[in-house]
Protein backbone atom coordinates (compact mmCIF):
# COMPACT_ATOMS: atom_id res chain seq x y z
CA UNK A 1 0.00 0.00 0.00
CA UNK A 2 1.39 3.39 -1.03
CA UNK A 3 1.42 5.95 1.76
CA UNK A 4 2.18 9.37 0.32
CA UNK A 5 -1.26 10.80 1.08
CA UNK A 6 -4.85 9.83 1.96
CA UNK A 7 -7.70 10.11 -0.55
CA UNK A 8 -11.07 11.46 0.54
CA UNK A 9 -13.79 11.02 -2.05
CA UNK A 10 -16.65 13.46 -1.51
CA UNK A 11 -16.67 16.92 0.10
CA UNK A 12 -19.93 16.73 1.99
CA UNK A 13 -20.19 16.88 5.77
CA UNK A 14 -18.41 13.56 6.35
CA UNK A 15 -15.73 14.03 3.70
CA UNK A 16 -14.94 17.59 4.74
CA UNK A 17 -14.63 16.55 8.39
CA UNK A 18 -12.45 13.56 7.50
CA UNK A 19 -10.12 15.66 5.35
CA UNK A 20 -9.78 18.27 8.10
CA UNK A 21 -8.97 15.65 10.75
CA UNK A 22 -6.31 14.07 8.53
CA UNK A 23 -4.66 17.34 7.49
CA UNK A 24 -4.47 18.68 11.06
CA UNK A 25 -2.43 15.56 11.88
CA UNK A 26 0.20 16.55 9.33
CA UNK A 27 -0.81 14.13 6.57
CA UNK A 28 -1.38 15.22 2.94
CA UNK A 29 -4.96 14.82 1.69
CA UNK A 30 -6.42 14.67 -1.79
CA UNK A 31 -10.13 15.45 -1.60
CA UNK A 32 -12.13 14.64 -4.71
CA UNK A 33 -15.45 16.35 -5.43
CA UNK A 34 -17.39 16.00 -8.67
CA UNK A 35 -19.73 18.95 -8.03
CA UNK A 36 -18.57 21.82 -10.20
CA UNK A 37 -18.24 19.39 -13.09
CA UNK A 38 -21.30 17.24 -12.45
CA UNK A 39 -24.19 18.07 -10.13
CA UNK A 40 -26.42 15.74 -8.12
CA UNK A 41 -30.24 16.04 -8.32
CA UNK A 42 -30.27 17.79 -4.92
CA UNK A 43 -27.19 20.01 -4.60
CA UNK A 44 -27.21 23.59 -5.89
CA UNK A 45 -23.55 24.59 -5.48
CA UNK A 46 -20.03 23.18 -5.63
CA UNK A 47 -19.26 24.22 -2.04
CA UNK A 48 -18.18 21.80 0.65
CA UNK A 49 -20.71 20.56 3.24
CA UNK A 50 -23.75 21.96 1.42
CA UNK A 51 -26.91 21.43 3.48
CA UNK A 52 -29.64 20.10 1.22
CA UNK A 53 -32.48 19.36 3.66
CA UNK A 54 -32.98 21.34 6.87
CA UNK A 55 -30.65 24.05 8.17
CA UNK A 56 -30.89 22.69 11.73
CA UNK A 57 -28.29 20.58 13.50
CA UNK A 58 -30.97 19.87 16.12
CA UNK A 59 -30.81 20.08 19.92
CA UNK A 60 -27.95 21.88 21.65
CA UNK A 61 -28.24 20.68 25.27
CA UNK A 62 -26.08 17.71 26.33
CA UNK A 63 -29.19 16.15 27.91
CA UNK A 64 -30.21 15.61 24.28
CA UNK A 65 -28.26 12.83 22.51
CA UNK A 66 -27.39 14.92 19.46
CA UNK A 67 -26.37 17.78 21.75
CA UNK A 68 -24.02 15.41 23.55
CA UNK A 69 -22.62 14.22 20.23
CA UNK A 70 -21.94 17.82 19.20
CA UNK A 71 -20.12 18.49 22.48
CA UNK A 72 -17.98 15.39 21.96
CA UNK A 73 -17.17 16.53 18.43
CA UNK A 74 -16.34 20.01 19.69
CA UNK A 75 -13.80 18.49 22.07
CA UNK A 76 -12.33 16.55 19.15
CA UNK A 77 -11.91 19.82 17.20
CA UNK A 78 -14.63 19.20 14.59
CA UNK A 79 -14.58 21.67 11.70
CA UNK A 80 -18.31 21.09 11.16
CA UNK A 81 -19.14 22.13 14.73
CA UNK A 82 -16.83 25.15 14.44
CA UNK A 83 -18.63 26.17 11.25
CA UNK A 84 -22.05 25.69 12.84
CA UNK A 85 -21.21 27.82 15.86
CA UNK A 86 -19.67 30.53 13.68
CA UNK A 87 -22.75 30.76 11.42
CA UNK A 88 -25.46 30.07 14.01
CA UNK A 89 -28.92 31.64 13.60
CA UNK A 90 -31.65 31.88 16.29
CA UNK A 91 -33.56 28.60 16.75
CA UNK A 92 -34.64 28.30 20.37
CA UNK A 93 -32.99 25.28 21.96
CA UNK A 94 -31.63 24.01 18.64
CA UNK A 95 -28.43 24.73 16.70
CA UNK A 96 -29.44 26.09 13.29
CA UNK A 97 -27.12 27.74 10.78
CA UNK A 98 -27.02 30.13 7.87
CA UNK A 99 -26.69 27.65 4.99
CA UNK A 100 -24.41 29.66 2.72
CA UNK A 101 -22.23 30.96 5.52
CA UNK A 102 -21.87 27.44 6.89
CA UNK A 103 -20.74 25.97 3.55
CA UNK A 104 -18.43 28.93 2.91
CA UNK A 105 -16.75 28.42 6.30
CA UNK A 106 -16.16 24.69 5.76
CA UNK A 107 -14.97 25.20 2.18
CA UNK A 108 -12.50 27.85 3.29
CA UNK A 109 -11.16 25.95 6.32
CA UNK A 110 -10.62 22.70 4.44
CA UNK A 111 -9.54 23.82 0.97
CA UNK A 112 -7.14 26.50 2.26
CA UNK A 113 -5.22 24.05 4.45
CA UNK A 114 -1.68 23.71 3.05
CA UNK A 115 -1.85 19.90 3.15
CA UNK A 116 -5.18 19.65 1.32
CA UNK A 117 -5.37 19.33 -2.46
CA UNK A 118 -8.86 19.78 -3.91
CA UNK A 119 -9.49 17.87 -7.14
CA UNK A 120 -12.71 18.52 -9.07
CA UNK A 121 -13.21 15.13 -10.64
CA UNK A 122 -15.72 12.30 -10.63
CA UNK A 123 -14.22 9.11 -9.21
CA UNK A 124 -15.69 6.05 -10.90
CA UNK A 125 -13.68 3.27 -9.29
CA UNK A 126 -12.34 2.31 -5.85
CA UNK A 127 -8.58 2.85 -5.37
CA UNK A 128 -6.94 -0.42 -4.36
CA UNK A 129 -3.44 0.44 -3.16
CA UNK A 130 -3.95 3.79 -1.38
CA UNK A 131 -5.58 4.79 1.89
CA UNK A 132 -9.02 6.02 0.92
CA UNK A 133 -12.18 7.28 2.59
CA UNK A 134 -15.32 7.13 0.47
CA UNK A 135 -17.82 9.70 1.71
CA UNK A 136 -19.91 10.36 -1.38
CA UNK A 137 -23.20 10.39 0.47
CA UNK A 138 -26.67 9.18 -0.41
CA UNK A 139 -26.42 10.72 -3.89
CA UNK A 140 -23.34 8.79 -5.00
CA UNK A 141 -22.97 8.81 -8.79
CA UNK A 142 -24.26 5.71 -10.53
CA UNK A 143 -20.84 4.62 -11.78
CA UNK A 144 -19.21 4.71 -8.33
CA UNK A 145 -22.31 3.28 -6.65
CA UNK A 146 -22.14 0.30 -8.99
CA UNK A 147 -18.46 -0.21 -8.15
CA UNK A 148 -19.24 -0.08 -4.43
CA UNK A 149 -22.01 -2.67 -4.86
CA UNK A 150 -19.67 -4.81 -6.93
CA UNK A 151 -16.88 -4.48 -4.34
CA UNK A 152 -19.13 -5.30 -1.39
CA UNK A 153 -20.94 -8.12 -3.14
CA UNK A 154 -24.29 -6.78 -1.98
CA UNK A 155 -27.01 -4.62 -3.49
CA UNK A 156 -27.59 -2.78 -0.22
CA UNK A 157 -30.74 -0.82 0.52
CA UNK A 158 -32.36 2.38 -0.65
CA UNK A 159 -35.05 4.80 0.44
CA UNK A 160 -36.10 8.38 -0.20
CA UNK A 161 -35.27 11.58 1.61
CA UNK A 162 -37.57 14.56 1.12
CA UNK A 163 -36.63 18.22 1.66
CA UNK A 164 -38.99 20.91 3.00
CA UNK A 165 -39.94 24.09 1.11
CA UNK A 166 -38.36 27.46 1.93
CA UNK A 167 -40.41 30.66 1.79
CA UNK A 168 -39.70 34.40 1.63
CA UNK A 169 -40.30 35.97 5.06
CA UNK A 170 -41.77 39.09 3.46
CA UNK A 171 -44.63 37.03 2.04
CA UNK A 172 -45.85 35.84 5.47
CA UNK A 173 -49.07 37.41 6.82
CA UNK A 174 -47.96 38.22 10.38
CA UNK A 175 -51.51 39.13 11.43
CA UNK A 176 -52.34 35.40 11.49
CA UNK A 177 -49.20 33.99 13.11
CA UNK A 178 -47.18 34.42 16.30
CA UNK A 179 -43.60 33.88 17.43
CA UNK A 180 -42.90 31.32 20.12
CA UNK A 181 -40.64 28.36 20.89
CA UNK A 182 -42.24 25.18 22.20
CA UNK A 183 -42.71 25.37 25.99
CA UNK A 184 -41.07 28.85 25.76
CA UNK A 185 -37.61 27.26 25.64
CA UNK A 186 -35.02 29.83 24.59
CA UNK A 187 -36.04 32.83 22.52
CA UNK A 188 -39.28 32.96 20.54
CA UNK A 189 -37.48 31.93 17.37
CA UNK A 190 -40.22 30.03 15.51
CA UNK A 191 -43.09 31.54 13.57
CA UNK A 192 -46.23 29.56 14.41
CA UNK A 193 -49.16 29.23 12.02
CA UNK A 194 -52.17 28.05 14.10
CA UNK A 195 -55.02 26.05 12.59
CA UNK A 196 -58.58 25.49 13.72
CA UNK A 197 -60.03 21.99 13.58
CA UNK A 198 -61.88 22.79 10.35
CA UNK A 199 -58.75 24.24 8.75
CA UNK A 200 -56.72 21.18 9.74
CA UNK A 201 -59.31 18.76 8.33
CA UNK A 202 -59.41 20.61 5.01
CA UNK A 203 -55.61 20.73 4.92
CA UNK A 204 -55.25 16.99 5.56
CA UNK A 205 -57.77 16.16 2.84
CA UNK A 206 -55.93 18.42 0.39
CA UNK A 207 -52.62 16.72 1.20
CA UNK A 208 -54.06 13.25 0.69
CA UNK A 209 -55.55 14.13 -2.70
CA UNK A 210 -52.64 16.25 -3.97
CA UNK A 211 -50.69 14.99 -6.97
CA UNK A 212 -47.20 13.70 -6.24
CA UNK A 213 -44.18 14.15 -8.47
CA UNK A 214 -43.29 11.04 -10.51
CA UNK A 215 -40.57 8.85 -9.00
CA UNK A 216 -38.81 8.36 -12.33
CA UNK A 217 -36.52 5.34 -12.24
CA UNK A 218 -36.56 5.07 -8.45
CA UNK A 219 -37.50 1.74 -7.01
CA UNK A 220 -39.72 0.73 -4.09
CA UNK A 221 -40.70 3.53 -1.72
CA UNK A 222 -38.94 2.81 1.56
CA UNK A 223 -39.14 5.95 3.67
CA UNK A 224 -36.96 6.61 6.72
CA UNK A 225 -39.26 7.80 9.51
CA UNK A 226 -37.08 10.81 10.35
CA UNK A 227 -37.57 12.43 6.94
CA UNK A 228 -41.06 11.21 5.98
CA UNK A 229 -42.94 13.32 3.41
CA UNK A 230 -45.81 15.25 4.98
CA UNK A 231 -48.28 13.77 2.49
CA UNK A 232 -47.27 10.27 3.60
CA UNK A 233 -48.01 11.27 7.20
CA UNK A 234 -51.42 12.59 6.16
CA UNK A 235 -52.24 9.25 4.56
CA UNK A 236 -51.27 7.30 7.68
CA UNK A 237 -54.19 8.61 9.67
CA UNK A 238 -56.03 11.62 11.03
CA UNK A 239 -53.77 12.15 14.06
CA UNK A 240 -50.37 11.31 12.60
CA UNK A 241 -49.49 14.93 11.81
CA UNK A 242 -50.99 16.12 15.12
CA UNK A 243 -48.45 13.97 16.95
CA UNK A 244 -45.71 14.93 14.50
CA UNK A 245 -44.73 18.25 12.88
CA UNK A 246 -48.15 19.86 13.52
CA UNK A 247 -48.20 19.06 17.25
CA UNK A 248 -49.71 22.04 19.13
CA UNK A 249 -48.55 21.08 22.64
CA UNK A 250 -46.47 23.83 24.27
CA UNK A 251 -47.44 26.39 21.61
CA UNK A 252 -50.32 28.17 23.34
CA UNK A 253 -51.60 31.41 21.84
CA UNK A 254 -49.77 34.39 23.36
CA UNK A 255 -52.06 36.82 25.20
CA UNK A 256 -51.40 39.53 22.63
CA UNK A 257 -52.44 37.28 19.70
CA UNK A 258 -55.44 38.79 17.87
CA UNK A 259 -55.68 36.44 14.89
CA UNK A 260 -58.25 33.70 14.15
CA UNK A 261 -58.62 30.97 16.77
CA UNK A 262 -60.86 28.07 17.85
CA UNK A 263 -63.24 29.76 20.29
CA UNK A 264 -61.60 30.46 23.63
CA UNK A 265 -59.16 27.53 23.55
CA UNK A 266 -55.69 28.50 24.80
CA UNK A 267 -53.97 26.08 22.41
CA UNK A 268 -54.58 25.80 18.65
CA UNK A 269 -55.92 22.54 17.23
CA UNK A 270 -52.78 22.23 15.08
CA UNK A 271 -49.69 24.35 14.41
CA UNK A 272 -47.33 24.62 11.44
CA UNK A 273 -43.94 25.98 12.49
CA UNK A 274 -41.58 28.07 10.38
CA UNK A 275 -37.88 28.11 11.26
CA UNK A 276 -35.37 30.78 10.30
CA UNK A 277 -33.21 29.52 7.45
CA UNK A 278 -30.54 32.20 7.10
CA UNK A 279 -28.75 34.80 9.25
CA UNK A 280 -30.71 37.76 7.90
CA UNK A 281 -34.06 36.05 8.69
CA UNK A 282 -35.29 36.68 5.15
CA UNK A 283 -35.99 32.98 4.58
CA UNK A 284 -37.96 30.44 6.61
CA UNK A 285 -38.42 26.71 6.10
CA UNK A 286 -41.60 24.83 6.97
CA UNK A 287 -40.52 22.54 9.81
CA UNK A 288 -41.10 18.85 9.16
CA UNK A 289 -42.78 19.47 5.79
CA UNK A 290 -40.50 17.38 3.59
CA UNK A 291 -42.46 16.58 0.47
CA UNK A 292 -42.46 15.20 -3.04
CA UNK A 293 -45.68 16.81 -4.24
CA UNK A 294 -45.62 18.51 -7.63
CA UNK A 295 -44.54 22.13 -7.30
CA UNK A 296 -47.91 23.54 -8.36
CA UNK A 297 -49.61 21.31 -5.79
CA UNK A 298 -47.20 22.45 -3.10
CA UNK A 299 -48.15 26.06 -3.74
CA UNK A 300 -51.87 25.28 -3.73
CA UNK A 301 -51.87 23.12 -0.59
CA UNK A 302 -49.29 24.95 1.52
CA UNK A 303 -50.96 28.30 0.85
CA UNK A 304 -53.91 26.86 2.81
CA UNK A 305 -51.76 27.29 5.95
CA UNK A 306 -52.90 30.39 7.88
CA UNK A 307 -50.43 33.20 7.28
CA UNK A 308 -49.07 31.63 4.10
CA UNK A 309 -51.95 32.54 1.77
CA UNK A 310 -49.56 34.59 -0.37
CA UNK A 311 -46.36 32.72 0.43
CA UNK A 312 -43.57 33.05 -2.11
CA UNK A 313 -41.60 29.82 -2.40
CA UNK A 314 -37.86 30.37 -2.72
CA UNK A 315 -37.38 26.62 -2.97
CA UNK A 316 -40.04 23.97 -3.36
CA UNK A 317 -39.73 20.69 -1.55
CA UNK A 318 -37.95 17.97 -3.51
CA UNK A 319 -37.32 14.28 -3.06
CA UNK A 320 -34.23 12.21 -3.75
CA UNK A 321 -33.05 8.66 -3.42
CA UNK A 322 -30.88 7.97 -0.42
CA UNK A 323 -28.95 4.72 -0.59
CA UNK A 324 -26.94 3.14 2.19
CA UNK A 325 -24.79 0.09 2.84
CA UNK A 326 -25.32 -3.14 4.71
CA UNK A 327 -22.92 -1.89 7.38
CA UNK A 328 -23.48 -4.74 9.88
CA UNK A 329 -21.89 -7.11 7.38
CA UNK A 330 -19.52 -4.75 5.62
CA UNK A 331 -17.94 -2.34 8.12
CA UNK A 332 -15.86 -2.33 11.31
CA UNK A 333 -16.51 0.13 14.15
CA UNK A 334 -13.63 2.22 12.82
CA UNK A 335 -15.61 2.66 9.55
CA UNK A 336 -13.05 0.45 7.81
CA UNK A 337 -14.15 -2.04 5.22
CA UNK A 338 -14.05 -5.61 6.56
CA UNK A 339 -12.84 -6.65 3.14
CA UNK A 340 -10.06 -4.11 2.54
CA UNK A 341 -8.29 -2.58 5.56
CA UNK A 342 -7.06 0.53 3.76
CA UNK A 343 -10.59 1.48 2.65
CA UNK A 344 -12.97 3.47 4.84
CA UNK A 345 -16.56 4.58 4.29
CA UNK A 346 -18.20 7.53 6.04
CA UNK A 347 -21.39 9.58 6.01
CA UNK A 348 -24.99 8.67 5.33
CA UNK A 349 -24.04 5.82 3.01
CA UNK A 350 -22.95 3.90 6.13
CA UNK A 351 -26.41 4.13 7.69
CA UNK A 352 -25.90 7.02 10.08
CA UNK A 353 -28.74 9.49 9.63
CA UNK A 354 -28.47 13.24 10.04
CA UNK A 355 -26.00 16.06 9.47
CA UNK A 356 -24.25 15.76 12.82
CA UNK A 357 -24.10 11.97 12.67
CA UNK A 358 -22.62 12.09 9.15
CA UNK A 359 -19.95 14.54 10.23
CA UNK A 360 -19.20 12.40 13.30
CA UNK A 361 -18.62 9.35 11.10
CA UNK A 362 -16.20 11.38 8.97
CA UNK A 363 -14.40 12.50 12.12
CA UNK A 364 -13.93 8.91 13.32
CA UNK A 365 -12.92 7.68 9.86
CA UNK A 366 -10.46 10.57 9.45
CA UNK A 367 -8.81 9.95 12.82
CA UNK A 368 -8.45 6.24 12.09
CA UNK A 369 -7.20 6.69 8.55
CA UNK A 370 -4.50 8.97 9.99
CA UNK A 371 -3.68 6.34 12.62
CA UNK A 372 -3.34 3.68 9.93
CA UNK A 373 -1.15 5.99 7.82
CA UNK A 374 1.19 6.41 10.80
CA UNK A 375 1.21 2.66 11.59
CA UNK A 376 -0.58 3.28 14.89
CA UNK A 377 -3.40 1.34 16.51
CA UNK A 378 -6.82 2.51 15.35
CA UNK A 379 -9.23 3.99 17.90
CA UNK A 380 -12.55 2.38 18.78
CA UNK A 381 -14.67 4.87 20.69
CA UNK A 382 -16.69 3.00 23.35
CA UNK A 383 -20.47 2.78 23.21
CA UNK A 384 -20.62 4.68 26.50
CA UNK A 385 -20.03 7.76 24.30
CA UNK A 386 -22.40 9.15 21.69
CA UNK A 387 -19.67 9.15 19.04
CA UNK A 388 -18.93 5.50 19.81
CA UNK A 389 -22.54 4.35 20.05
CA UNK A 390 -23.30 5.11 16.40
CA UNK A 391 -20.56 2.99 14.78
CA UNK A 392 -21.28 0.25 17.31
CA UNK A 393 -24.97 0.28 16.40
CA UNK A 394 -24.54 0.25 12.62
CA UNK A 395 -21.97 -2.56 12.77
CA UNK A 396 -23.71 -4.76 15.35
CA UNK A 397 -27.43 -4.50 14.61
CA UNK A 398 -29.36 -7.23 12.79
CA UNK A 399 -28.58 -6.88 9.09
CA UNK A 400 -32.03 -8.12 8.06
CA UNK A 401 -33.73 -5.19 9.76
CA UNK A 402 -31.00 -2.57 9.44
CA UNK A 403 -32.20 0.97 8.76
CA UNK A 404 -30.49 4.38 9.07
CA UNK A 405 -30.07 5.57 12.64
CA UNK A 406 -29.95 8.94 14.35
CA UNK A 407 -27.99 9.22 17.57
CA UNK A 408 -30.28 8.61 20.56
CA UNK A 409 -29.69 7.76 24.20
CA UNK A 410 -31.32 4.44 23.36
CA UNK A 411 -28.14 3.27 21.60
CA UNK A 412 -25.72 4.64 24.22
CA UNK A 413 -24.79 2.05 26.85
CA UNK A 414 -26.91 2.21 30.00
CA UNK A 415 -25.50 3.46 33.28
CA UNK A 416 -24.41 0.88 35.85
CA UNK A 417 -26.64 0.39 38.87
CA UNK A 418 -30.37 0.96 39.37
CA UNK A 419 -32.10 2.84 36.55
CA UNK A 420 -32.62 6.53 37.33
CA UNK A 421 -36.30 7.23 36.75
CA UNK A 422 -36.03 10.95 36.05
CA UNK A 423 -35.01 11.27 32.38
CA UNK A 424 -33.18 14.58 32.68
CA UNK A 425 -31.17 13.36 35.66
CA UNK A 426 -30.40 10.07 33.90
CA UNK A 427 -29.30 11.75 30.68
CA UNK A 428 -27.19 14.24 32.63
CA UNK A 429 -25.35 11.32 34.25
CA UNK A 430 -24.92 9.59 30.87
CA UNK A 431 -23.49 12.80 29.40
CA UNK A 432 -21.09 13.27 32.32
CA UNK A 433 -19.83 9.70 31.98
CA UNK A 434 -19.47 10.10 28.22
CA UNK A 435 -17.49 13.32 28.41
CA UNK A 436 -15.23 11.99 31.16
CA UNK A 437 -14.55 8.87 29.07
CA UNK A 438 -13.84 10.97 26.00
CA UNK A 439 -11.45 13.21 27.92
CA UNK A 440 -9.43 10.13 28.89
CA UNK A 441 -9.38 8.86 25.29
CA UNK A 442 -8.30 12.25 23.92
CA UNK A 443 -5.42 12.33 26.38
CA UNK A 444 -4.38 8.70 25.87
CA UNK A 445 -4.60 8.78 22.06
CA UNK A 446 -3.34 12.36 21.66
CA UNK A 447 -6.44 13.35 19.69
CA UNK A 448 -6.71 17.03 20.67
Swiss-Prot record:
- Say which domain of life the source belongs to: Bacteria
Signal peptide annotation: none
> Which top class of enzyme applies to this chain?
transferase
Catalytically driven reaction(s):
uridine(54) in tRNA + (6R)-5,10-methylene-5,6,7,8-tetrahydrofolate + NADH + H(+) = 5-methyluridine(54) in tRNA + (6S)-5,6,7,8-tetrahydrofolate + NAD(+); uridine(54) in tRNA + (6R)-5,10-methylene-5,6,7,8-tetrahydrofolate + NADPH + H(+) = 5-methyluridine(54) in tRNA + (6S)-5,6,7,8-tetrahydrofolate + NADP(+)
Q: Which residues form a coiled coil?
A: none
The family database entries (PANTHER family) matched by this protein are listed as:
GLUCOSE INHIBITED DIVISION PROTEIN A, METHYLENETETRAHYDROFOLATE--TRNA-(URACIL-5-)-METHYLTRANSFERASE TRMFO
Q: What is this protein called?
A: Methylenetetrahydrofolate--tRNA-(uracil-5-)-methyltransferase TrmFO
Q: What is the lineage of its organism?
A: Bacteria, Bacillati, Bacillota, Bacilli, Lactobacillales
Amino acid sequence: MRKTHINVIGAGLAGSEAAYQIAKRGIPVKIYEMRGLKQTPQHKTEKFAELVCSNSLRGAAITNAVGLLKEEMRRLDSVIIKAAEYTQVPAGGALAVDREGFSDFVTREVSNHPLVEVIREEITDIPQDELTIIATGPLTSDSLANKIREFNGADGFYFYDAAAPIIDANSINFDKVYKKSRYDKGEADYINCPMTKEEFQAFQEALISAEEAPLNSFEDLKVFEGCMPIEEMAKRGYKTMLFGPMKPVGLEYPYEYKGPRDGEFRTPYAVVQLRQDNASASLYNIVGFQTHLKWGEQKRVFQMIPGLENAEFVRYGVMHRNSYMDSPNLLKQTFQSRKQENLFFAGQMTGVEGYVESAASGLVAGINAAKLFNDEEVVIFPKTTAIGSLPYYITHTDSKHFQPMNVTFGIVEELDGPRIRDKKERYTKVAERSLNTLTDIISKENLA
